[in-house]
Design a protein with these regions (language model features):
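Charged alpha-helix within mobile-element recombinases
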Residues: 1, 149-151, 155-206
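Structured nucleic-acid-interacting core domains from mobile-element enzymes and related host factors
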Residues: 59-69
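Short, conserved catalytic/metal-binding motifs centered on acidic residues
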Residues: 1, 9, 72, 92, ...
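Basic, flexible linker segments flanking DNA-binding modules
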Residues: 2-61
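Short, well-ordered secondary-structure micro-motifs
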Residues: 81, 142-145, 171
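Acidic/histidine-rich, metal-coordinating catalytic segments
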Residues: 72, 123-142, 162-164
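Short conserved beta-strand segments at catalytic cores or DNA/RNA-binding microdomains
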Residues: 61, 72-74, 79-95, 111
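Active-site beta-loop-alpha junctions of metal-dependent nucleic acid enzymes
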Residues: 76-79, 96-122
Length: 206
């Protein structure tokens, strides 16, 4: 009898014991570890209201002199440390923040620390980054961490690109392609430090 089930469905039902044979009965099957499931965070629909790419276009048309900064995340090994890239479009300069993981809590924490560090040197985050454009990654779902200062007052406008529309923020995408010339896809960042990121970021803009 021909099995008409998709491959993934067949494997799943096999592992659940729906067939007369078990993984232990297959010499090759026991060599492979089950794949880990990595749940990803998502951005609530309420957070996207008034912050979609169409809204961004309207905002920049009304405020053409406000410089934009593009945000994105470079992933190393899945589940490991990541790099959040910050590209200043007008000056064509990219910096990076080294994060322990790709979660909204970690991203919000690092942005908060950056704001405090800037304030300690007499700088205001909103003056340097008044406008942000990022993708739909769940790590950017804590909107207030990016938009508000320590007093809870808005200092920055954050907007999201449309899903699967990397071309809407082309500068970071171009830099990430060059970044991969230095650090190949799927290479772990766990041995990196912030100093490593500081060295790589300018190199990936050559």
């Amino acid at each position: 009898m021909t099995c008409l089930c998709p491959q993934q469905q067949y494997i799943a039902t096999f592992r659940r014991g729906y067939y007369s044979i078990r993984p232990i009965d297959l010499p090759r099957a026991v060599k492979f570890k089950p794949r880990k499931s990595h749940r990803t965070e998502s951005i609530p629909s309420s957070a996207k209201q008034g912050r979609m790419y169409e809204d961004y276009c309207d905002f920049t048309e009304e405020n053409p002199n406000i410089p934009c900064t593009e945000l994105d995340t470079v992933i190393g090994e899945v589940g490991g440390k990541v790099i959040m890239t910050i590209h200043f479009v007008n000056s064509d300069f990219m910096a990076g923040l080294f994060l322990d993981n790709k979660t909204a809590a970690e991203t919000a924490s690092e942005i908060g620390q950056l704001k405090q560090k800037l304030a300690s040197h007499g700088f205001v985050f909103g003056d340097i980054i008044p406008l942000l454009l990022t993708d739909n990654g769940g790590e950017f779902s804590c909107v207030s961490a990016f938009e508000n200062n320590t007093d809870g007052e808005q200092e920055t406008k954050l907007f999201f690109c449309e899903p699967a529309a990397a071309y809407e923020k082309p500068h970071t995408e171009k830099n990430h392609t060059m970044f991969r010339d230095i650090v190949p896809q799927d290479q772990s960042f766990d041995s990196f430090t912030q100093e490593t990121v500081n060295l790589i970021s300018p190199m990936s803009m050559r």
